[in-house]
Amino acid sequence: MKAFMQRAYGPPDSLTFEDVPDPVPAEGEVLVRVHATSVNPYDWHFLRGEPYVARLMTGGFGLRRPPAGVLGCDLAGRVVTAGTRFAPGDDVYALLPRGAHAEYVCVPEDLLAPMPANLSHDQAAAMPMAAVTALLALRGVEAGRRVLVNGASGGVGTFAVQLAKALGAHVDAVCSAANADLARSLGAGEVFDYRADDFTRSGRRYDVVLDVAGRRSVFACRRVLERDGTFVAVGGPAGRWVQPAGHVFLAAAGGPLARRRVVLADAVACRDKAAVLGELARWAERGAVTPVVDRTYPFDDLRAAFAYSEAGHAKGKVVVTLGVPGRSA
């Protein structure tokens, strides 16, 4: 099969497009033909080995050079070999630790979920990492609550706006002026231009501030957070992947944030990924959530997809299709 192999840390051009042996499923796994995948910040942090903690997460053996392997955590495809829960021909999607940037991948059955019935493989591939993160970030949000999504036009943000609206919350958004119409179309009310408006001095108050962009300090954000509100840290600018954990540490240390709840939304650490994907499939099938796909790249152009994603200007998700005939929306 064809796969993009990582054999060194570096830019997208460091990935090598190779012929590698077809994987053989172990007990509890099924073989899946990958129809589409995507690129996430999680992927390009491991590609570059930046920040350095990403290298420690390879198991401690990749400080100077990563273990040879395949990146990619978002998967939408079709089952090839039978398991106990899935049969050949079943359309599935999953959030993997890695391995989706290949034609085939062996997946533990307990990570797989049936694809949303109304979505194509390309659309479904946009969901796992971003949509799971967004849904985890909004746990506990009830109808009538006020939610602010900072970074509303990216992968996580576009799902967060839709999900918060579907949960009955009032949603405001922070993004560029160029993406304001997109945010409104997804359900946002007030939209702040991050270049021109200081949303932290808007005078508004929110029950939840979901920070995807990571360009304002948690102490500035507390100005718009209710005293019993929740600050949810998701991401930060390139090279500052550990920033969300820093927010949680500062809150735990006490001070002005001590009365407020600060949490970290981490899809990778989620223990019931398949169940969450099943929940998201139901939201999608009801029409409450639709993936926003900015660009779709052919598989052999994966390096360009990495470069575009890393530039940080994508509206929604960057999807990579493997050119296999599959389900259309």
What is the meaning of each model-derived region?
Residues F61-A76, D91-G151:
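NAD(P)H dinucleotide-binding glycine-rich loop of Rossmann-like/cofactor-binding domains
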Residues A125-D193:
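Mid-domain Rossmann-like dinucleotide-binding core that forms the NAD(H)/NADP(H) cofactor-binding site
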Residues R201-V208:
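A short acidic, Gly/Pro-enriched loop at the edge of an enzyme's catalytic core
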Residues A281, R286-R295, R303-A329:
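C-terminal capping/lid region of NAD(P)-dependent oxidoreductase domains
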Residues D91, R146, H170, G229-T230:
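Short glycine-centered segments of the SAM/dcSAM-binding site in methyltransferase folds
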Residues V212, R216-A288, G323-A329:
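Glycine-rich phosphate-binding loop and adjacent beta-alpha segment
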Residues P21-S38, Y52-R98:
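Glycine-rich beta-strand-centered segment in the early N-terminal region that forms part
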